[in-house]
Amino acid sequence: MKISDKLLHPDWKEKVTYSYEFFPPKTSTGVQNLYNRIDRMKTWGRPMFVDVTWGAGGTSSELTPGIVNVIQTDFEVDTCMHLTCTNMSTEMIDAALKRAHETGCRNILALRGDPVKDTDWTEGESGFRYASDLVRYIRTHYNDEFCIGVAGYPEGYSPDDDIDESIKHLKLKVDEGADFIVTQMFYDVDNFIAWVDKVRAAGINIPIFPGIMPIQAWDSFIRRAKWSGVKIPQHFMDTLVPVKDDDEGVRERGVELIVEMCRKLIASGITRLHFYTMNLEKAVKMIIERLGLLDENLAPIVDTNNVELTNASSQDRRINEGVRPIFWRTRNESYVSRTDQWDELPHGRWGDSRSPAFGEFDAIRYGLRMSPKEITTSWGSPKSYSEIGDLFARYCEKKISSLPWSDLPISDEADLIRDQLLSMNRNAFLTINSQPALNGEKSSHPVFGWGPPNGYVFQKPYVEFFVHPSLLNELKETVKKLNSVSYFVTNKNGDLDTNSQYEIPNAVTWGVFPNREIIQPTIVESTSFLAWKDEAYSLGMEWANAYSPDSISRKLLVSMMKEWFLCVIVDNDFQNGQSLFDVFNKMRSLKDIHPELYYANAS
């Protein structure tokens, strides 16, 4: 989505917003670390956009579009791609714009840019001498395909710059077609506000995003201020010098200084904060949290025509997507990747399930984003099924924030069924996804609500879990006695058993809204379930492989992934939310049938 369109959207227009800048790392490991960081930062709340820098002289012309593609398509966060014209031919400019457009990126930050290190700037054959030339070229040849941003320099591009003259150059870029301004970093907030007043007086009325540089450490703070030529207010020095040899102290005091600066900006009516992250996250999170913005924008955008299921549209064709299988509820990026080649995405209902072919699960990109050390720190080294059950129970109690099948903490809606989930997991019915019954909750409800205002939302109770083979027959027989309950069961090989009609979707979430058809955003369906099981078992095997080959934990988890069944149960009687869990109250548990398996170490 274009930044200019977002700024007009009611979910963004009146709010304080934030956005991030990242730069392309030089190694593949660095790139993966960046993706992991973005994945974490996305859970804080919804950034308006993420921008990715362009190397001097086009040195990252391959890497920058690739990173933009992953952020836009896989993480479903709207992007803004930097594009410089230094040492760039017209063909290179067109190629970069084409790649950006293909990924769904509709925002370009047009810059002159610096020459490659140890070379002088020369005007290329393309005739791009200034950023205004690039803005004119994009607007002339691509019309309104892109929202174009330009740089603003509140303290001048260099220390000797005439500010009034630089504002004239800024006005030229705006006249050529720029839609928004991202400014150079600064610390003198009073000077910045005065500069904004001058910009407005010059007839420049497009949105301004102030560039906020968090203070991470003393040396980097001084180096960046000197490099960019910005003024450091005396009270910054008075606050930081006493702790300059203490990185934690500098970060803590630096956060307070930046928070104070942001509050002053917001009070003056400047509400679009743009963070230069330097590919780091801790200080940025501290600032956002202390500004009271953490998680504030996490709810999905709802416009007047469509209900979007994701934080931002990854591609224009996903804007109207309205239905997804529930299995990927906590693994959105993987679902987008596996459906990226679909010609049509379901909108009002889930279509013929025989038509879409899910792509293969990309375990390298969408597998566990943790090192073996991080896995053992987070999940320990379980040595029995009882210990695994306790681990899953701790996730349901919010004592740990993730499991292999969910990168996110368990949702607040699960509080309604927490006791039932705890009982299931401690009896070795290992739950990886669930939702409680809802019967006409207001669409504005802070936990359960979604969709347009003045509506009502409904849910069928649903639970997905792994079960030991010795319990499978008893499970199916118990379910069959409850006419309202449907089940789907498969093993690692994909042998499916169900008491439902094959390939017929079962809506498990729906909403009723004024002047609208009923919206059914999540479903359960057999073909999707079989596609999901490949991913579910793969994630479990990745967890196992984090331990040494001869370890008890490795053997235990491998055995579980090879032998246990993956089950989904839906109670179609959503007015009776307890009957689904009555299934497990009527059953024996693994520790009842095989205590030697439940408590014993793997051999």
Swiss-Prot record:
Cellular component, GO annotation: mitochondrion
Pathway: One-carbon metabolism; tetrahydrofolate interconversion
Binding site for NAD(+): 21-26, 53-54
Catalytic activity: (6S)-5-methyl-5,6,7,8-tetrahydrofolate + NADP(+) = (6R)-5,10-methylene-5,6,7,8-tetrahydrofolate + NADPH + H(+); (6S)-5-methyl-5,6,7,8-tetrahydrofolate + NAD(+) = (6R)-5,10-methylene-5,6,7,8-tetrahydrofolate + NADH + H(+)
Residues annotated with Phosphoserine modification: 355
Disruption phenotype: Leads to strict auxotrophy for methionine.
Matching InterPro entries: FAD-linked_oxidoreductase-like, Fadh2_euk, Mehydrof_redctse-like, MTHFR_C
GO biological process, one term: tetrahydrofolate interconversion
Domain of life: Eukaryota
Cofactor(s) the protein requires to work: FAD
Main enzyme class: oxidoreductase
Amino-acid positions noted as binding FAD in the UniProt annotation, renumbered to this chain: 53-54, 82, 112-114, 130-131, 153, 173
Coiled-coil regions, chain positions: none
Keywords attached to this entry: FAD, Flavoprotein, NADP, Oxidoreductase, Phosphoprotein
Keyword Membrane part of the UniProt annotation: no
EC number(s) stated in the UniProt entry for this protein: 1.5.1.20
Gene Ontology molecular-function annotations: FAD binding; methylenetetrahydrofolate reductase (NAD(P)H) activity; methylenetetrahydrofolate reductase (NADH) activity; methylenetetrahydrofolate reductase (NADPH) activity
Annotated residues for binding of substrate: 114, 184, 276
Active site residues of this protein: 21
UniProt function note: Major methylenetetrahydrofolate reductase required to generate the methyl groups necessary for methionine synthetase to convert homocysteine to methionine. Performs 80 to 85 percent of the total methylenetetrahydrofolate reductase activity of the cells.
PANTHER family: METHYLENETETRAHYDROFOLATE REDUCTASE (PTHR45754), METHYLENETETRAHYDROFOLATE REDUCTASE (NADPH) (PTHR45754:SF3)
Similarity field: Belongs to the methylenetetrahydrofolate reductase family.
UniProt name for this protein: Methylenetetrahydrofolate reductase 1
